[in-house]
Regions:
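The feature captures the beta-strand-to-loop junction immediately N-terminal to the Walker
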Residues: 35-37
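Helix-to-loop junction immediately C-terminal to a conserved catalytic motif
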Residues: 50
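Conserved ABC transporter NBD signature motif
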Residues: 58-69, 75
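Conserved ABC ATPase "signature" region
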Residues: 98, 113-131
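Conserved ABC ATPase signature
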Residues: 110, 135-139, 143
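Catalytic Walker B motif of ABC-type/P-loop ATPase nucleotide-binding domains
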Residues: 160-164
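ABC ATPase nucleotide-binding domains
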Residues: 235-256
Length: 256
């Protein structure tokens, strides 16, 4: 069953048409990565799903709801989006994570016990309980990304969107973030859709992969499917060799 459905969507910027009749579905309760060359429409796709942008034609549905017909608070209760670029605000880690609860009661309403419990659970799940009172601006890149993921977890939406969550992170922090992203599905039952720029990370941590180029969906399926790997080679003009680890995960070796 699909959590997200785009049906015959057309969209662009100004006179530039990016998507023309695009249809795609994202499965419920899975981690799906969207990969493709720069400018192929990956981030714009997330903006359409999240309601930041509206399609020229076609419909975008999340859990059966037409996104264009929802209020901003209605969207925030269905899905959360961690954008690619976000500066650390002048507040503590705990205060940042608490922002995730605003869609449930508003900016000025008092938080109740359930809100505080959700914040503490999110801090613990992301390994930030001991950093809760530290200013978010003082965190390392990996810690800061975990803090934003904790905010998303506190928001407690059934659908979570990530736009290049590992950008500008070192290798160790990348793996930490991907493990956290995976845990949103495995431990919390979320549907996760992420734009990932690293082919290996996408194939290693995803249940399904969508390969895009020039605003079109080239292939969608599991990382092991031959059609998906062929589309990766076509989209990036590389050769891909898929290796299988002892725990069942996949590793991509690619070269020109």
């Amino acid at each position: 069953m699909a959590s997200i459905q785009l049906s015959d969507v057309s969209f662009g910027y100004g006179e530039h048409v990016l998507f023309s009749g695009l249809s795609i579905e994202f499965a419920r309760g899975k981690v799906t990565s969207i990969i493709g060359p720069n400018g192929c429409g990956k981030s714009s796709l997330l903006k359409l799903v999240s309601g930041i942008c509206k399609p020229w034609e076609g419909t975008v549905r999340v859990l059966g709801h037409d996104v264009a017909a929802l209020s901003s608070k209605g969207r925030a209760r269905l899905l959360s989006l961690l954008a690619q670029e976000h500066a650390a605000p002048p507040m503590s880690v705990r205060q940042l994570v608490t922002c995730g609860r605003y869609p449930h009661h508003g900016m000025l309403a008092a938080m109740d016990a359930a809100d505080y419990e959700a914040v503490e659970r999110a801090l613990a799940a992301c390994g930030l309980s001991n950093l809760a009172e530290r200013p978010a601006a003082e965190l390392s890149g990996g810690q800061r990304q975990r803090a934003f993921i904790a905010m998303v977890l506190a928001q407690d939406t059934p659908v979570v969107l990530f736009d290049e969550p590992t950008s500008f992170l070192d290798v160790s922090a990348c793996y930490d973030v991907m493990e956290l992203m995976r845990s949103l599905k495995e431990e919390h039952g979320k549907t996760v859709v992420a734009v990932i720029h690293d082919i290996d990370l996408a194939l290693r941590y995803s249940d399904e992969v969508c390969v895009m180029r020039d605003g079109k969906l080239l292939a969608q399926g599991t990382p092991q499917e031959a059609e998906v790997l062929a589309a990766v080679e076509d989209a990036f003009d590389v050769r891909v060799e898929l290796l299988h680890g002892e725990l069942g995960n996949s590793y991509a070796l690619w070269r020109r």
